[in-house]
Amino acid sequence: SKGLYQSFKVSNAEYVPAVFNDLGFPYAFCHHFTTYLVDRPEGFSRAGAEEWETGDRTGLGKDVSVIMVMNEAFSDITDAPAFPYTEENDPLPNLHALRRDPHALSGHVVVPGFAGGTANTEFDVLTGMQTMALSASTTSAMRVVNRNLDSLFRVFGNDGYETSFYHPGDNWFYNRENVYRWFGAEESLFIGDMEAPEYKGRWVTDDYTADLIERAFEEAEAPLFHFTTTIQNHMSYTADKYGPDYEFPPTGIP
């Protein structure tokens, strides 16, 4: 039961290998196996789903490279009244400058979870499907993917684009190594593939990751579709996240 499972003490509840090591493989595996079920929607049929497809349309405009970056745990805190700031101490000046650009389109994304489940947002954005619609118990959409799926990688790839995915974290986490292959990404790059990564605290910096993305764009021999999930802002969010000597910028909060 969920209550019994959560009653056991583990060294790090957020780190899956630690949970399996502390509770033992058979019990942890059997518990997690029950959370990966996908509910069949009422009235669903494969034939009916195929009728929804309207066919591909190509040649509607100039092919341009598309780069998507999902910044780990990012949120526009200036939207929340709990975080006041002065104009001089705007915590997100670059974001706000981009929003004001007359050529920019901006908006808000509502993600399928809070304080966890990073890969669920990746799944929703790339496939157009919704994690929350899979089942009431699914903890991660990535853990139910086990075959090729249509995604933005395939949409762009079928139109002659090079496609790639970068994540400066472990390839096994959320089974990303396999899932992104099933999504259709031609190239996947993880922390084990990166040369001399730069760290800030425990995690690879966004600056280093941005340099990798820029290099991929410059070296592409065809229009590029690229998706990156960063990691610098990953938990934990303690005062020593970036080391004991890190000086935090002023908040502007009275």
Task: State the predicted function of each range.
Residues 55-61, 68-71, 76-254:
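Solvent-exposed soluble domains appended to multi-pass membrane proteins
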Residues 1-63, 85-108, 142-146, 150:
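N-terminal secretory/membrane-targeting segments
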